[in-house]
Swiss-Prot record:
Name the UniProt record assigns to this protein: Succinate dehydrogenase [ubiquinone] flavoprotein subunit, mitochondrial
Residues annotated as transit peptide in the record: 1-43
Activity regulation (record text): Enol-oxaloacetate inhibits the succinate dehydrogenase activity.
EC supergroup of this enzyme: oxidoreductase
Species name: Bos taurus (Bovine)
Membrane topology: Peripheral membrane protein
Main subcellular location of this protein, as a coarse class: mitochondrion
Catalysed reactions, semicolon-separated: a ubiquinone + succinate = a ubiquinol + fumarate; (R)-malate + a quinone = enol-oxaloacetate + a quinol; (S)-malate + a quinone = enol-oxaloacetate + a quinol
Length: 665
């Protein structure tokens, strides 16, 4: 039986009385299980405490490890820990298969060599180049070397990959992928399940997770980390269904909450992509890294923002302007439509700016697929055919799809090393935060640097979700003593929740959120300029101040979505602040975004010339470095620091460092 399905039925079957006077007795009667598992072997050890507030009794739980988030990264970390014998909780604000991983379309990269000779070192080279040399090469080494085994593991779990005629996993071409270190032409490295790879991957991992005795806390909203003496000792969460507060104490905590795409007005992200983990880390006084690097996917449906996978171009689709030109030949003569995403998005924007856009407003371009055989479209791109008809009214076998770059992915996030350990930077040195890990889009390992290659995100999920579990298993044993917390731990989180629940200002949550999203869209888009960024900083800071004037309408605790959306808005605001202040401070153009007032990349050397005889620029005078951002929660003031990019690989004899160069496609 599905553990989470059992959860749902159990919750529906018995609803607790929600008056505060009845809570404590209800929790203690033992008539309702708090830990929902696959086979029901575990007994609840929950204890009720009123140390924080008599109005909000807190239910305490204890685990070896807690994973926050149940998308691809969270599920892989959770069942990896359970498989190793750890008593593991998985806290998720969504039913696992509703996580945003399900929306990924194109595929997952791995140098399997099923279509032609391939090598993971070529994949490594492409990823470093795609990152515009802001990626950490030790983490990229780890990810690309682990990629083939990770895909085979998924196949063994039952993931139904598309196949070649001889039964091998089918691999399509994807942007920025090459053979022989960029000298051997286009690589076919992207393993896929038609154009629904994320859907298949998430359901495969979810099905696998049900083999293990993991405790699921479904539709619980994580409020904050429980930090003591610089260590993470768990999380405090709100049960959305009944409004109860839960402290989940654990020796190790893994954040896998996804990205913060909803800081922007037009994006491919689900409405639940609200940067919850990123904000939790910020409130804990820890840094976030490289949040200014936001990826604009070249092909979102014009007017809707829905994703049209890069796999369309991998299958032979082409971008055309109003004159019918295949314009990418001008900007990327070799890769053309399969250049990296930053190159394609900027090229599309330039075509529109120069008057060659399509439609009455000349404000988009076309993605043409109707020159491809209908049988190929039906087999390789069935989801896109359906999406284009629903959201654009287009029959892809007869007419092109109107597309426009739209926010798609966050390269930045919580800084980690290649083992998934969350980092702080002290006196020029990286230090791990005891008990805290992160993976997936919430994390910044940094394998994507300033620009992610398509189909590396699903790879990131499974490789680093697994890495977190392995790293914890190396440093801890199941049943190790769980550190204690103060009796009033989480008090500030409950006070904040109460304040928002009874907020009676003048601004609706939806109104303030829309103002933030439109400001980010207009002030921090693909092309950026200093004066506009400065105006955006002032605007977002002002909007952050407006959080004090919010008005909520639902005062209850049962399924209070008004309260949950307001908590999510707080999280989005923290992400937006760090994004726009980091963007304003970075006086160069690197990766996804492009500064029109600083059009060149600023490295420690001028790599357009031989470096012999050049003097290396001091760290303070170049921008090949990671941004670390902190926010004063009370004032909204953003503080920026910087840490070096890691250029060494894990083993130089096995995988040589790729030295910086001027990127071209």
């Amino acid at each position: 039986m599905s553990g989470v399905a059992a959860v749902s039925r159990l919750w529906r079957a018995r609803r607790l009385a929600l008056t505060c006077t009845k809570w404590s007795a209800a929790w203690q009667t033992g008539t309702r299980s708090f830990h929902f598992t696959v086979d029901g072997n575990k007994r609840s050890s929950a204890k009720v405490s009123d140390a924080i507030s008599a109005q909000y009794p807190v239910v305490d739980h204890e685990f070896d490890a807690v994973v926050v988030g149940a998308g691809g990264a969270g599920l892989r970390a959770a069942f990896g820990l359970s498989e190793a014998g750890f008593n593991t909780a998985c806290v998720t604000k969504l039913f696992p298969t509703r996580s945003h991983t399900v929306a990924a379309q194109g595929g997952i990269n791995a140098a399997l060599g099923n279509m032609e000779e391939d090598n993971w070192r070529w994949h490594f080279y492409d990823t470093v180049k795609g990152s515009d040399w802001l990626g950490d090469q030790d983490a990229i080494h780890y990810m690309t070397e682990q990629a083939p085994a990770s895909v085979v593991e998924l196949e063994n779990y039952g993931m139904p990959f598309s196949r070649t005629e001889d039964g091998k996993i089918y691999q399509r071409a994807f942007g920025g992928q090459s053979l022989k270190f960029g000298k051997g032409g286009q690589a076919h490295r992207c393993c896929c399940v038609a154009d629904r790879t994320g859907h298949s991957l998430l359901h495969t991992l979810y099905g696998r997770s049900l083999r293990y005795d993991t405790s699921y806390f479904v539709e619980y909203f994580a409020l904050d980390l429980l930090m003591e003496s610089g260590e993470c000792r768990g999380v405090i969460a709100l049960c959305i269904e009944d409004g109860s507060i839960h402290r989940i104490r654990a020796r190790n905590t893994v954040i896998a909450t996804g990205g913060y795409g909803r800081t922007y007005f037009s994006c491919t992200s689900a409405h639940t992509s609200t940067g919850d983990g990123t904000a939790m880390v910020t409130r804990a006084g820890l840094p976030c890294q490289d949040l200014e690097f936001v990826q604009f996917h070249p092909t979102g449906i014009y007017g809707a923002g829905c994703l049209i996978t890069e796999g369309c171009r991998g299958e032979g689709g082409i971008l055309i302007n109003s004159q019918g030109e295949r314009f990418m030949e001008r900007y990327a003569p070799v890769a053309k439509d399969l250049a990296s995403r930053d190159v394609v998005s900027r090229s599309m924007t330039l075509e529109i700016r120069e008057g060659r856009g399509c439609g009455p407003e000349k404000d988009h371009v076309y993605l043409q697929l109707h020159h491809l055989p209908p049988a190929q479209l039906a087999m390789r791109l069935p989801g896109i055919s359906e999406t284009a008809m629903i959201f654009a009214g287009v029959d892809v076998t007869k007419e092109p799809i109107p597309v426009l770059p739209t926010v798609h992915y966050n390269m930045g996030g919580i800084p980690t090393n290649y083992k998934g350990q969350v980092l702080r930077h002290v006196n020029g040195q990286d230090q791990g935060v005891p008990g805290l890990y992160a993976c997936g889009e919430a994390a910044c390992a940094s394998v994507h640097g300033a620009n992610r290659l398509g189909a590396n995100s699903l790879l990131d999920l499974v490789v680093f979700g697994r890495a977190c579990a392995l790293s914890i298993a190396e440093s801890c044993r199941p049943g190790d003593k769980v550190p204690s917390i103060k009796p009033n731990a989480g008090e500030e989180s409950v006070m904040n929740l109460d304040k928002l629940r009874f907020a009676n200002g003048s601004i609706r949550t939806s109104e303030l959120r829309l103002n933030m999203q439109k400001s980010m869209q207009s002030h921090a888009a693909v092309f950026r300029v200093g004066s506009v960024l400065q105006e955006g900083c002032e605007k977002i800071s002002s909007l952050y101040g407006d959080l004090r004037h919010l008005k909520t309408f639902d005062r209850g605790m049962v399924w209070n979505t008004d309260l949950v959306e307001t908590l999510e808005l707080q999280n989005l605001m923290l992400c937006a602040l760090q994004t726009i202040y980091g963007a304003e401070a970075r006086k160069e153009s690197r990766g996804g975004p492009r500064r029109e007032d600083f059009k060149e990349r600023v490295d420690e050397y001028d790599y357009s010339k031989p470096i012999q005889g050049q003097q290396k620029k001091p760290f303070e005078q170049h921008w090949r470095k990671h941004t670390l951002s902190y926010v004063d929660i009370k004032t909204g003031k953003v503080t920026l620091e910087y840490r070096p990019v890691i250029d060494r690989t894990l083993n130089e004899t096995d995988c040589a460092t790729v030295p910086p160069a001027i990127g071209s496609y």
